[in-house]
């Protein structure tokens, strides 16, 4: 069935700004769940846990691009990040559908429409003031050198501003355990790629950067490329988010496949600290013994995108350096360096989000020379497969 995205969600909160939304892009929408398993509830009955909600959006005339896009949101967010923006504007799902891509949008396990049960572990929420400081009003707080360059968030970015309130109302609880979140996403994400059955483009944001590496590590043959928007980092430590030693596997908290193999990352991954950039150190692998490689990620084309004013600006270079050291071919686009100014961590929700999406699209398409006909044939084969499954059409 053809539907129009509900871009009027929260519209009552922003109508005082006289925002005039553009017409949305029509698409065919389906949803389904992947992963998970039955578990004993402790009373002799069973519950289903660790499943992941997936929303599948397809251009009404069918996709004309070879690879589907799988969009993975960050911490305290849901898949609504990719639909419409809190100011009422079109989101990235509409942008990519308009350009011929089919999109799969997930809610992380134990998040949003992916049910949480007590057995999944303790949950937490991000206070509005933290969102202001790190995402939406960074110029007010100046917690890192580039923070004052932030100009692209619509509105003031603080409590009481209707656009901020609309955005903050969309944030949700999340699992406190990063390992629990990563391992359940890894399993559910692998199940999603198995269901799609052909190589995809993973677009990850923030916390989901780790999820993308893990899913690709599990199903490298089903990942065409990865676009990591300000991925979780830097390796082995937290900088802005102060806390305990983190990402003991370098890019993740959960195990990755290294060569030579690693059992105990804290002792087997030998580290060094470098200070290649003023005011920003970086922990990477030591030069001796030779750095361990990430063989399942080496063949996957990867793009890391960093916004000019984000708290990732001082540290994303370190993530890229670690990846290169582990044998991954990675492109790093710093938006400020190509004339896209003023963006923060939530760059896909900001005023110039389409301009940034165009950068991603050009990168995707310059590497993809396969004819569109094959995409349509693959879509037809997938449709026949889905008709036999439990997918529910809205």
Swiss-Prot record:
Gene3D superfamilies: alpha/beta hydrolase (3.40.50.1820). It is an enzyme of class 3 (hydrolase). Pfam families: Abhydrolase_6 (PF12697). It catalyses: a carboxylic ester + H2O = an alcohol + a carboxylate + H(+). Residues 366-394 are annotated as: Disordered. Keywords: Glycoprotein, Hydrolase, Lipid degradation, Lipid metabolism, Secreted, Serine esterase, Signal. GO terms for cellular component: extracellular region. Its EC number is 3.1.1.1. Residues 366-376 have a biased composition (Basic and acidic residues). GO terms for molecular function: carboxylesterase activity. It is found in: Secreted. CDD domains: Esterase_713_like-2. Glycans are attached at residue 120. GO terms for biological process: lipid catabolic process. InterPro entries: AB_hydrolase_1, AB_hydrolase_fold, Carboxylesterase_BioH. PANTHER family: AB HYDROLASE-1 DOMAIN-CONTAINING PROTEIN, HYDROLASE ALPHA/BETA FOLD FAMILY. Belongs to the AB hydrolase superfamily. This is Probable secreted lipase ARB_00047.
């Amino acid at each position: 069935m053809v539907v129009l995205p509900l871009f009027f969600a929260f519209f009552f909160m922003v109508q005082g700004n006289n925002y005039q939304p553009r017409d949305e892009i029509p698409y065919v929408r389906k949803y389904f769940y992947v992963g998970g398993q039955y578990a004993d509830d402790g009373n002799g009955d069973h519950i289903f846990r660790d499943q992941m909600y997936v929303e599948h959006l397809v251009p009404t005339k069918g996709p004309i691009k070879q690879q589907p896009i799988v969009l993975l949101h960050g911490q305290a967010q849901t898949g609504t990040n990719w639909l419409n923006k809190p100011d009422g504007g079109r989101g990235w799902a509409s942008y990519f559908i308009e350009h011929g891509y089919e999109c799969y949008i997930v809610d992380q396990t134990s998040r949003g429409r992916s049910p949480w049960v007590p057995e999944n572990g303790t949950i937490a929420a991000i206070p509005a003031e933290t969102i202001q400081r790190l995402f939406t009003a960074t110029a007010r707080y100046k917690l890192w050198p580039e923070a004052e360059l932030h100009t692209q968030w619509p509105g003031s970015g603080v409590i009481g501003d209707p656009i901020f309130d609309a955005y903050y109302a969309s944030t949700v609880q999340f699992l406190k355990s990063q390992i629990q979140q990563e391992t359940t996403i890894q399993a559910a994400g692998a199940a999603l790629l198995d269901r799609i059955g052909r190589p995809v483009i993973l677009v990850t944001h923030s916390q989901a950067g780790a999820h993308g590496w893990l899913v690709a590590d599990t199903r490298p043959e089903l990942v065409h490329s990865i676009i990591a928007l300000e991925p979780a980092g830097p390796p082995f430590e937290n900088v802005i988010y102060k806390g305990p030693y983190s990402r003991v596997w370098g890019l993740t908290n959960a195990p990755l496949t290294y060569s030579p193999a690693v059992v105990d990352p804290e002792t087997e991954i030998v580290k060094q600290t470098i200070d290649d950039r003023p005011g920003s150190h970086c922990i990477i692998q030591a030069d001796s013994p030779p750095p361990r490689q990430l063989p399942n990620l080496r063949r996957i084309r990867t793009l890391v995108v960093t916004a000019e004013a984000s708290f990732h600006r001082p540290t994303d270079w370190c993530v890229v350096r670690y990846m290169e050291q582990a044998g991954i071919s990675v492109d790093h686009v710093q938006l400020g360096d190509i004339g896209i100014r003023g963006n923060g961590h939530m760059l896909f929700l900001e005023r110039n989000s389409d301009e940034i999406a165009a950068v991603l699209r050009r990168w995707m398409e310059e590497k993809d020379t396969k004819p569109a006909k094959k995409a349509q044939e693959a879509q037809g084969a997938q449709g026949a497969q889905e008709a036999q499954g439990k997918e529910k059409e809205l």
